[in-house]
UniProtKB/Swiss-Prot annotation:
The gene is UL43. Keywords: Virion, Virion tegument. Belongs to the herpesviridae US22 family. It comes from Human cytomegalovirus (strain Merlin). This is Tegument protein UL43. InterPro entries: US22-like (IPR003360). Residues 1-12 have a biased composition (Polar residues).
Length: 423
């Protein structure tokens, strides 16, 4: 194949054919910022190389510092602007490095916290859980973990066996004092708010099966806060600790909020009775978690006419109770929805009546706390007072625990049914 005159001229000049030259542009700049003169008209101008060569060339030269546009335009760069630009880039580099270091530190802390939580859970479900937990707590005593709720609350590993926190209680026999048939109950730390003043920390205990409890020193009772072990406790926080929900929770009304607020402001049974006469048949709704609950206010005559009124007085150990309203379609366990009547006694305590058994169950210490905590305690009251299983008559029926925390695996229940009897 014969060559064209242009290719003959290029080869004779000692140049390589233009299609194989990986050049990027025909204009180059010298170190002083001036543009070189173009080639003579007799030499044909080279066009950019093929796209494949261009990509390889640009990739191989990506590490080079190409001159700014000001250089190509013939503008001189002063030493002051260079220094300012260098200082600016140094500051950006330092900030980026500090952010990266902080992110790495947080990631490391989170990873260590997750590993510690998992190790605590593993120790709580071993065959020798009490001894394994004691060793772990003494090794990591003072370590702090952040809880998901409430905001600003922390869990701190602490060896309460050596501190003597429980004083007169026999800490080695706490499971016999408060629980039904658990083999051990060991304190592993406390929960508190870092800036709280005058609020005593709440001890956290782990029982058989990894279940987590919180001890309330005010009423000397244990509250079951996590059935899924220590990992569930850290993830859920104290959402299942009803006294704290009553104190720190919030009320959300959907409709008829003015009616609900009037009930929260009522001070005694007489004020509630007058409010029922005034708001007879009124409907308002509020949210309990993700559920919107519709509430119907009863009239004054219905507050005392229920045949079970005398039984409610005995079950709640009250001098007087008032049936104020009915909450419709409340979701309970086993995917049931019930219409629950709400009772209030002379001290302001709130109770819910199961529609099937007509028994009263304690819900909250007041109507404000009831709208905050909702039906968390309804048929789910795992609050264990001292000797509540050995002497159940010491606790009023409405305040008694729903049952053993082991539920169907309760050793006393299985022994009573003869499940352990030899055939």
């Amino acid at each position: 194949m014969e060559k064209t005159p242009a290719e003959t001229t290029a080869v004779s000049a000692g140049n390589v054919p233009r299609d194989s030259i990986p050049c990027i542009t025909n204009v180059s700049a010298d170190t002083r910022g001036r543009t070189r003169p173009s080639r003579p008209a007799t030499v044909p101008q080279r066009r950019p190389a093929r796209i494949g060569h261009f990509r390889r060339r640009s990739a191989s030269l990506s590490f080079l510092d190409w001159p700014d546009d000001s250089v190509t335009e013939g503008v001189r760069t002063t030493s002051a602007s260079v220094a300012a630009s260098a200082a600016r880039f140094d500051e950006i580099r330092r900030r980026r490095q500090s952010i990266n270091d902080e992110m790495k530190e947080r990631t490391l802390e989170d990873a260590l916290a997750v590993e510690l939580v998992n190790e605590t859970f593993r120790c709580s479900v071993t065959s020798d859980a009490r001894k394994d937990l004691q060793k772990l707590v003494r090794r990591v005593s003072g370590t702090v973990l952040r809880l998901s709720w409430p905001n600003g609350w922390f869990f701190t590993y602490c060896d309460l066996l050596r501190v003597g926190y429980f004083g007169h209680l026999n800490i080695k026999g706490l499971e016999k004092t408060f629980l039904c048939c658990d083999k051990f109950l060991l304190p592993v730390g406390t929960v508190s708010r870092c800036e709280a003043i005058g609020r005593p920390p709440l001890p956290v205990l782990i029982g058989e099966g990894g279940r987590v409890y919180v001890y309330s020193p005010v009423v000397e009772s244990l509250y079951l806060v996590s059935r899924s072990g220590f990992r569930g406790f850290v993830q859920e926080g104290l959402r299942n600790y009803a006294p704290l929900r009553e104190e720190l929770g919030y009320v959300r009304f959907e409709t008829g909020g003015d009616v609900g607020r009037e009930f929260m402001l009522a001070r005694d049974l007489l004020a509630l009775w007058r409010l029922c006469m005034k708001r007879e048949g009124s409907i308002f709704s509020w949210r309990d978690g993700n559920e919107a609950l519709t509430t119907v206010v009863l009239n004054g005559s219905q507050t005392y006419e229920d045949p079970a009124h005398g039984n409610w007085l005995k079950e709640t150990c009250s001098l007087n109770v008032l049936q104020v309203f009915v909450v419709r379609a409340v979701p309970v366990e086993s995917q049931q929805r019930l219409d629950i009547s709400i009772l209030v006694n002379e001290s302001g305590a709130v109770f819910g009546v199961h529609p099937d058994t007509r028994q009263a169950h304690f819900l909250a210490r007041g109507l404000l706390g009831f709208f905050r905590v909702g039906f968390l305690r309804f048929c789910n009251n795992y609050c264990f007072a001292r000797d509540c299983f050995t002497h159940p008559e010491s606790v009023a029926p409405a305040y008694r625990a729903t049952g053993c925390p082991r539920e169907l695996f309760c050793r006393r229940l299985r022994k009573k049914k003869g499940l352990f009897a030899r055939r």
